[in-house]
């Protein structure tokens, strides 16, 4: 079984992986991953390119189902429910576990419709004042309301890159998820927009559990409560972020964070 640094804590576990293995065809991409994701905390996944961190992230809402030849063994649980149980509704899983991608990907619709589309589709609200209120609340939650409140009918694609990413975050929180997955959400953004998104993440963890993949170790150190280091599909070490960066227990972790490989 994969060795990793485990935490002893009475924190509430929101999601967990147990003996998780994943293959793309004949290639094994994840090896015996065991990890607890804590509620209303930010967990950063770090490691060199191809280490498995984004693959693991996508296991948490079954996005890997969309990849041909993908096979998963082991458990991934959210609130104690195995999300890979054949009886589980995958759409319901993805409603509870939202996703924000590396490149901002607003729908080719108005700002308003970007937010309203999924809640209307899932019958969370009806058209009218309730929907208007949800759109406003979601945009406020993503720190975007004041910038767009007078142009809600404008295309979401007309916004700046940083605004588009916040629109995607607003779209994700509009369906009231419990977990938000972020796959390198600032890698395509300028430093000012990056800082805005980082500040937003810290605010959002008051309501949501956040798991973020990042190549930026400084970003992990700034925003994450916990950090997991992946290498060659294995979870090498997982602990409080400060411990990972100040006093890592594994030599491979120390080598990575000091730039000796990566």
From Swiss-Prot:
It is found in: Cell inner membrane. The gene is pstB. It comes from Wolinella succinogenes (strain ATCC 29543 / DSM 1740 / CCUG 13145 / JCM 31913 / LMG 7466 / NCTC 11488 / FDC 602W) (Vibrio succinogenes). Pfam families: ABC_tran (PF00005). It catalyses: phosphate(out) + ATP + H2O = ADP + 2 phosphate(in) + H(+). It is a peripheral membrane protein. Keywords: ATP-binding, Cell inner membrane, Cell membrane, Membrane, Nucleotide-binding, Phosphate transport, Translocase, Transport. One of its GO terms (biological process) is phosphate ion transmembrane transport. This is Phosphate import ATP-binding protein PstB.
């Amino acid at each position: 079984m994969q060795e990793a640094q485990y935490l002893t804590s009475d924190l509430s576990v929101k999601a967990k992986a147990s003996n998780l293995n994943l293959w793309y065809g004949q290639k094994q991409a994840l090896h015996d991953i065991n990890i607890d994701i804590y509620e209303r905390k930010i967990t950063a996944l770090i490691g060199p390119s191809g280490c498995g961190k984004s693959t693991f992230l996508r296991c948490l809402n079954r996005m890997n189902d969309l990849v041909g030849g993908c096979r998963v063994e082991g458990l991934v649980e959210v609130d104690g429910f195995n999300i890979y149980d054949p009886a589980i509704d995958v759409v319901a899983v993805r409603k509870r576990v939202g996703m924000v991608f590396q490149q901002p990907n607003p729908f080719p619709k108005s700002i308003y419709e970007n937010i309203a589309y999924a809640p209307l589709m899932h019958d969370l609200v009806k058209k009218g004042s309730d929907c208007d209120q949800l759109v406003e609340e979601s945009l406020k939650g993503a720190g975007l309301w004041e910038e767009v409140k007078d142009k809600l009918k404008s295309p979401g694609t007309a916004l700046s890159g940083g605004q588009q990413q916040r629109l995607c975050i607003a779209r994700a929180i509009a369906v009231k998820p419990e977990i938000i997955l972020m796959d390198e959400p600032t890698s395509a953004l300028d430093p000012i927009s990056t800082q805005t998104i980082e500040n937003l993440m810290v605010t959002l963890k008051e309501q949501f559990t956040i798991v973020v993949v990042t190549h930026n170790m400084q970003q992990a150190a700034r925003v994450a409560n916990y950090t997991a280091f992946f290498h060659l599909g294995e979870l090498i070490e997982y602990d409080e972020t400060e411990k990972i960066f100040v006093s890592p227990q594994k030599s491979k972790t120390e080598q990575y964070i000091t730039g000796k490989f990566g």
